[in-house]
Every structure is written in structure tokens, then in C-alpha cells.
């Protein structure tokens, strides 16, 4: 501030000196008139006198400021940053500030094709870094900066190359979706619709290739937006399989991504099949792989058999990889046909290869020679495995007596009350099933109390069990 104040102090002294010298009369001849900025003074009439002499340099023109009063050019003018709408430059103070001190710096620009230098600010700025804003994309211009003192502006410092305002460059990046990082499989006739996002500034240019060649526009369409590229195939064919490469470019920068597409269909059937051998209940088969695997690996073969009598096919083996097999557990006396399907990711082949010959499972010439067999006698006299149990009942409510007996042949069951048979009495119902004997007494009364006996009789003997039934009358209220 002291330096600035010092430079501002004498800023007007040269002009004041020149003005005063023009107004104060001098000892020079009256014909000599000093040239000044005042029009009025230029119109003063000339006195009658001898011819005037030529004016001296000190009175005719304003003296140029000495070189030591003007600052030198700023140092190290540097371009710090360029964006899509602004530019920032910085510099170092000049080596020589001048005797009158530094008032600031003037930053100017000159657009390409123009000759006029336009100041960025209306007055000098006491800063060594400045940002020019609100620039338009595509602008191209030169920049210079000058140091200014009271005596005037010093020589400028200028950038060597013009500045070009353009979008910030962001290196392109392709973000391949996770499901496309491995082989993308579609079936013949299905739609292929791939959307690949990317990044980059300014707007990247995207191109596709198929196996290193340009895309066939008759089959494949491509659309590129600001942030993604779409590859579309309406009806995929096996010829569309291959390596698709997406290249995204931003000026000299580029990014690439590779997507493998595999278009598949159902395989053809095995080329041939042969019945190798038949023995016992077994048959051996052999076949050759199909000529067309459907543009992908086989998952295996399905082997089926059919009995000549029924004609129904039954699966014997699934996803079987070898080309030979042995089928066992065939039924003696039947004749069998065999067929084989091929299988891949799309499923089974539409047709199968069938054996021309039948496999006849012959009956073996074996005569059975049974050894002597001793038949076991399972006859058994009756015996009770579960006896009758004493029971107490309430009048008017049916009650049941249970026991179980074992005997062979089946025994005859006789029920008795107080040693008297009760067969045929409608009050009682006797049942016997699987050795369990049941006697139901319908709505008993106290008169039905007594000892009940169950007797089992067959040709080998007899057995009996008994119990006591007590029917108690309800107490009177």
C-alpha cells in the first residue's frame, strides 16, 4: 500500500507542470505560443511582431515518460485451467515496477480473426491470477497481460499459443452389464437386444464390428445415444454368432468392450444306431454322434425302449454321454426296439434314430428241480391270549365284553351266563373276527348281573375264560 500510495501521489504532476507552463507568461518573444490542451488558449490572437520562431520540443509536445517510470512485462504468464466456459491464467510480478509504483494489471484478449485487443476488466486489477468467464464453446483467442503504473502500461506478456474453448474431455468408459460378461446365448428366431451404457465427454462416437468386420445393416441395427449404444437383431440366426466389439471414442481416447453371442438350435438325431448283441435279459447298443449339434455342445443322449406288444416308449437313460450302452432287466419272451435322441441346451432333437432289428429276449431252457419240501403243521388247540375282565355297568347303557383267542383250525365260540348258554337271545349280540371275541349286552338291567363265560372249541381241544358283570342301579334322589 505504501508503494501504491507513493505511485498515486505524483500521478498528476507532469500534467500540472505542463499546464502551468502554458499559462504563465515567459520572457520569450510575444509571437511564441505554447501548444496546450485548451482550445481557448489556441484561439488567442497573435501580436504584430517579427516572424515567429519554430516552437521548441519542450513547449510543442507532451514529454514521453522515461522508461524507468513504466513497469516491465509480467513474468511467467501461465495457463492454469480451461473449461467449457472459462479460462484461468496466472503470472508473476514484473522485475521492474517503475519509479511511480504499480497500479495493477490489465488482462486483454483478442479473438481469432480480429485485430482489436479487448480488456477483460474495466480497470487494472491488483491480482496475479484472473479467470475469464462466460465464454462460448468454440471460442479461440489470444491472451496478454500488462503491468500498469501512473506513467502508463508496460510491455505485455503474451501466451505462445491461442486458447480454444471446448468441452471438458472425459475419457470414455464402457460398463458392460453383468449378464453380458459371459457368452450371451439365444435360440434361433429369438430377438437380440443389447443395451450397453458408456460414459465420456464430449459425446462419444460409438462403432460396432462383428468378427472384425462392419455390421450387416440388412440383419443388424445399431442406435447410439448420449449414454448408451443399442444392438438389435429382430430374428437371430446361427450366422449371427460371433464376437461383437463396441468401440467408444472421444477425440484421441477410446474404450473397447467385447461381447460373445452364440445362437443355437436343437441338434439333429444320431447319425446311425446298431444293435450289437443280445444275451439273457440284456441288449447292447452303439450309435454315432449327430452331424449337426445345433451350434453348441451336446448335453448327452436319451435312450428309450419299446415292447413290440404295447408299442409304448419308456426312457432308459437320460443325458448319457458315451455312444455305447447296455440295457438290462428286459422281460423274457418280449421283443424290443430302441431309439436314441440327441440333447443340447435347446432340448431334445426333433426326431430319434431307431434300431432296425428287434432284440428278442429268449426263454432259457432251464428245468426246475425242486427239492423235497416238508409242510409244517400249524394246527393248534384254542388258547386265550387276552382273558375277560370284570366289568361294572349302569342300567340302560349298552356294555361290551372283550377277549382274544388263538386256534387252528378256527374255533367255535360259545357265550354263557352263569354256566347257561345265551346263544339266540336277542338281548345279546356275539361277534368274532381275527381272533377277537366280543359280547354286546344291550341296555342291561340289574337282572343281567352275573358270571359270563367265553368258550372256544375246535377238533384239538377247548378253552374258556370268564368274568363278573355287575349292573348297579342308580341311587334314588
From Swiss-Prot:
Residues 73-168, 269-364 form the Fibronectin type-III domain. Coiled coil: none annotated. Pfam families: fn3, I-set. The keyword Repeat applies. Mainly expressed in the skeletal muscle. Slightly expressed in the left atrium and arteria mammaria interna. Keywords: Cell adhesion, Immunoglobulin domain, Muscle protein, Phosphoprotein, Repeat, Thick filament. It comes from the Eukaryota. The keyword Cell cycle does not apply. The modification Phosphothreonine is found at residues 6, 26. This is Myosin-binding protein H. The gene is MYBPH.
